[in-house]
């Protein structure tokens, strides 16, 4: 049983990694439209799924592939890496943004290596700043990330992930536990953000639990609205002090 929260308890949920499976992506799109969806921009089904997501009223993000610590040599299409030249780095991001003009913001896919490097994060924020209104979400795939801090230096609206819903992607009980952890955090600080993926277990649990949350005093909002609310609730919010359950990628 989840205890009721005050009306000020706001949560936001991102389902990212969309684009490689059409069927799983379509199931994610059937979630309540307050759930924000983030597509891998060079994946085979990204364009089709993004169009369907927008049609169903979801806010759309781009899930930017970035180099990781755990597998630094594995570069999927469009991965931003330490050895990417500044010009190529910015051109790649510009291409993604041009291909998905409805995107309202970006978050990092993997990136436990790249998000530690201020120069590369500065290139990212400089590019985002050219597109007024875009926000950045630090997925916090490492506790050493400085990405959100750099976003703040460039006045990019930003926030950070608090909870990963599905570190155990096939375990429904684990997803429920993580969602309850998100709700507890939202009660404690007034707001909390989770990232999940289009795994069958995750989709099933969210379909079961999300419709009940309004009656328990929680408000589910898209990420753009979440950032606005967070700034009002916590004018001195520091992403580095955000509670996290980090998972290295």
Where do the model's predicted regions map?
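Glycine-enriched alpha-helix->loop->beta-strand junction motifs that scaffold or abut catalytic
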Residues: 31-34, 57-58, 127-134, 152-159
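Terminal interaction modules at protein C-ends
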Residues: 1-9, 176-180, 217-220, 224-227
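Hydrophobic faces of well-ordered beta-strands that scaffold small-molecule active sites
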Residues: 11-15, 35-37, 58-64, 106-108, ...
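Active-site groove signature of glycoside hydrolases
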Residues: 94-114, 195
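Alpha-helical scaffold elements lining the catalytic groove of polysaccharide deacetylases
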Residues: 75-98, 115-120, 149-187
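Active-site beta->alpha N-cap acidic-glycine motif
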Residues: 6-72
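Catalytic beta/alpha-barrel core
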Residues: 18, 37-42, 107-117, 129-143
């Amino acid at each position: 049983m989840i205890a009721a929260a005050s009306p000020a308890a706001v949560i936001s949920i991102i389902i990212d990694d969309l684009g490689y499976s059409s069927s799983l992506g379509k199931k994610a799109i059937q979630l309540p439209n307050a759930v924000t969806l983030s597509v891998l921009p060079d994946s085979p089904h990204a364009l089709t799924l993004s169009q369907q997501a927008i049609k169903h009223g979801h806010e759309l993000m781009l899930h930017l592939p970035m180099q990781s610590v755990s597998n630094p040599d594995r570069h999927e299409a469009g991965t931003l890496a330490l050895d990417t030249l500044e010009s190529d780095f910015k051109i790649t991001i510009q291409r993604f943004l041009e291909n998905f003009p409805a995107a309202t913001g970006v978050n990092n896919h993997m990136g436990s290596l790249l998000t530690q490097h201020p120069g590369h994060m500065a290139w990212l924020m400089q590019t985002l700043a050219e597109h007024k209104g875009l926000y950045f979400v630090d997925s916090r795939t490492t506790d050493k990330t400085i990405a959100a801090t750099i976003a703040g230096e460039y006045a990019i609206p930003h926030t950070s992930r608090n909870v990963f819903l599905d570190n155990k992607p096939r375990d429904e009980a684990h997803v429920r536990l993580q969602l309850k952890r998100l709700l507890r955090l939202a009660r404690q600080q007034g707001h909390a953000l989770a990232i999940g993926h289009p795994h069958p277990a995750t989709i099933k649990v969210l379909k079961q639990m999300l419709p009940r949350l309004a009656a328990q005093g929680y408000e589910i909002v898209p990420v753009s609205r979440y950032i606005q609310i967070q700034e009002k609730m916590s004018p001195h919010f520091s992403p580095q002090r955000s509670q996290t359950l980090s998972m290295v990628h």
